[in-house]
Amino acid sequence: MMSVGMLSFENVFFIAFSAYLVVILLMTAVSVYYLLKTLRGGDFALPDSELFKKAGKVVGKSFKDRGLTLHDLLWALELRGAVKMDSQSSKYYSTRPLKVNPEHLESYISAFLIAMNIRSDVTVKNESLIISIN
């Protein structure tokens, strides 16, 4: 019979795995926070579009691992006031960047989609970002 003070292997594994998931969740929240802060043009800004591509790849891989989609990213950006969704369907999104440089957002979303292995065409037309999923 096991006493109250002893921990079984299953309990230790569950505690360690839960701590691991909490750390992953916190890291994702921090990366999305800095993404939104960057896209808003706050005091933390990435001046180079190559940095936006790198950030897009990292967040894309993170979203893919967690089963999140492009729709989730655009929803988060709209929630923070960085973009305004003009129209959307299952394979088409039209957004208007509000507090974001459209070219930086284009490079970020392109890298995000590449990291998620989604074939797409991302273009900027008349200050709107058009995303077409192939």
UniProtKB/Swiss-Prot annotation:
Bilayer-crossing regions: 13-35
Keywords annotated in UniProt: Membrane, Transmembrane, Transmembrane helix
GO CC terms of this entry: membrane
Source species, domain of life: Archaea
Keyword Transmembrane: yes
Membrane topology recorded in Swiss-Prot or TrEMBL: Single-pass membrane protein
Principal subcellular localization: membrane
Compartments reported by the entry: Membrane
Protein name: Uncharacterized protein AF_1560
Species, as recorded: Archaeoglobus fulgidus (strain ATCC 49558 / DSM 4304 / JCM 9628 / NBRC 100126 / VC-16)
Lineage: Archaea, Methanobacteriati, Methanobacteriota, Archaeoglobi, Archaeoglobales
